[in-house]
Every structure is written in structure tokens, then in C-alpha cells.
């Protein structure tokens, strides 16, 4: 979604990696 894109762009790759890890843990990705 655009929110994930915006968050990744604004917060940086660290936030994106954290979000991806969170999704992977919950199996949502």
C-alpha cells in the first residue's frame, strides 16, 4: 500500500526491514 511505501521512504530501510520482519513473523506477507 501507499502507507508502506511512504513509511519506507520517510523512515528509511531500517523501518522497512522491521516491517517486513514483523509481517514474516505473523505470516501476513
Swiss-Prot record:
UniProt-annotated location(s): Secreted
Chief location: secreted
GO molecular function: galanin receptor binding; neuropeptide hormone activity
Gene Ontology cellular-component terms listed: extracellular space; secretory granule
Source organism superkingdom: Eukaryota
GO biological process: neuropeptide signaling pathway
This protein's record includes keyword Transport: no
Keywords: Amidation, Hormone, Neuropeptide, Secreted
PTM annotation (Alanine amide): residues: 29
Disulfide bond sites: none
A Pfam family that the UniProt record links to this protein: Galanin
PANTHER family named among the record's database cross-references: GALANIN (PTHR16839), GALANIN PEPTIDES (PTHR16839:SF1)
Its job: Contracts smooth muscle of the gastrointestinal and genitourinary tract, regulates growth hormone release, modulates insulin release, and may be involved in the control of adrenal secretion.
Family the UniProt entry places it in: Belongs to the galanin family.
Name of the protein this chain belongs to: Galanin
Organism of this sequence: Amia calva (Bowfin)
Gene name in the database record: gal
Amino acid at each position: 500500500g501507499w502507507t508502506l511505501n511512504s513509511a519506507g521512504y520517510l523512515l528509511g530501510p531500517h523501518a522497512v526491514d522491521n516491517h517486513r520482519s514483523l509481517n514474516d513473523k505473523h505470516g501476513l506477507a
